[in-house]
């Protein structure tokens, strides 16, 4: 992947991580105690983990050449939207998106798995 794309994706991952941290902070003060707060906490935690996958993947894409990087980023983004998004909505009393949660969870797992495959099977770009 071209370096400028890796840098752009790295910036997106860092921005999403900041948003996850902000969501966690806001949720701990604004969401009522109980199941709603637990759902919000879980959403922000996995939002952060998926953002971290994007950050790590973007850095690794600068070191190993592979065609798997973009799908791994896509899966992480879909995972954040579906898994964390459905839990954020659930904590606000909106349960219509609940069926998307498992899909999002699988996408986050797929993202991490693809990162591992890209590193294992990718060509090291730092060697001459």
Question: What are the roles of these predicted feature ranges?
Answer:
Residues 58-70, 91-94:
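Juxtamembrane helix-break-helix junctions at the cytosolic face
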Residues 15-25, 39-63, 74-81:
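Core segments of alpha-helical transmembrane spans in multipass integral membrane proteins
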Residues 27-36:
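Membrane-interface helix-loop junction between the first two transmembrane segments
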Residues 37-43, 96-106:
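Non-cytosolic membrane-interface motifs at loop->transmembrane helix junctions
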């Amino acid at each position: 992947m071209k370096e400028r794309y890796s840098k752009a994706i790295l910036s997106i991952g860092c921005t999403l991580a900041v948003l996850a941290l902000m969501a966690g902070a806001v949720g701990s003060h604004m969401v009522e105690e109980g199941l709603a707060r637990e759902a919000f906490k879980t959403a922000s935690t996995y939002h952060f983990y998926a953002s971290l996958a994007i950050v790590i993947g973007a850095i690794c894409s600068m070191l190993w050449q592979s065609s798997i990087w973009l799908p791994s980023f896509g899966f992480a983004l879909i995972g954040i939207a579906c898994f964390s998004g459905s839990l954020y909505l659930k904590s606000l009393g909106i349960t219509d998106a609940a069926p998307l949660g498992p899909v999002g969870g699988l996408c986050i797992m797929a993202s991490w798995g693809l990162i591992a495959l890209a590193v294992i099977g990718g060509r090291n770009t730092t060697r001459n």
